[in-house]
A protein has these predicted regions:
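Class I SAM-dependent methyltransferase SAM/SAH-binding core
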Residues: 1-34
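A short acidic, Gly/Pro-enriched loop at the edge of an enzyme's catalytic core
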Residues: 33-45
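A short SAM/SAH-binding and catalytic strip from SAM-dependent methyltransferases
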Residues: 43-56
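A short glycine-rich, Lys/Arg-flanked "PGG" loop and its adjoining helix->strand segment in the class I
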Residues: 58-70
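Conserved beta-strand signature within the Rossmann-like core of class I S-adenosyl-L-methionine
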Residues: 71-79
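Short "lid" loop at the C-terminus of a central beta-strand within the Rossmann-like core
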Residues: 79-84, 130
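Short alpha-helix
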Residues: 103-119
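Core SAM-dependent methyltransferase catalytic element
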Residues: 120-123, 127-149
Length: 149
């Protein structure tokens, strides 16, 4: 298993947890938009709550597609733009302040649309507002997509 992250603090936390669990894990310093990894070298990529803060989500998804083997799978769990128009309008209104206050996190990214545009076919998809979470921040999508050749 290989993990990539631009933040050394995140590496240390993940390495400690992986060691506790006995999981062999290789850490690579880098960004999702320009991974220092060979093309077509992974069967599966797991991405969780990342696209909200990655500066160029499109480039990150293109890089994920590049490092996946033909017909490789992307498994994702993300939050993003709500399907309800009124909620999406509020997300757009408060996103600039939200992004500044919360480390670059964006509320209103159209995750599923981006995945499709990056050359993936959605295989499974679930979505919902998380219970107990304000609707402007609680719309989540999760599923899997296959790299299209």
């Amino acid at each position: 298993m290989v993990g990539i992250d631009p933040c050394a603090t995140s590496w240390r936390m993940a390495q400690k947890r992986a060691s506790q669990l006995g999981v062999p894990l290789e850490f690579v310093h880098g960004s999702a938009e320009d991974m220092p990894l060979p093309s077509e070298s992974f069967d599966t990529v797991l991405m969780t709550f990342s696209l909200c803060t990655i500066p160029d989500g499109h480039a990150a998804l293109e890089e994920i597609r590049r490092v996946l083997k033909p017909e490789g799978r992307l498994v994702f769990c993300e939050h993003g733009e709500a399907p309800d128009e009124s909620v999406a309008r509020w997300q757009a209104r408060i996103n600039p302040m939200w992004r500044k206050l919360l480390g670059g996190c964006n509320l209103n990214r159209p995750i599923v649309n981006w995945i499709g545009k990056a050359g993936f076919g959605i295989q499974s998809l679930d979505q919902m507002y998380l219970p107990g979470t304000p609707r402007i921040a609680g719309f989540n999508v999760w599923g899997s997509a296959q790299r299209e050749c």
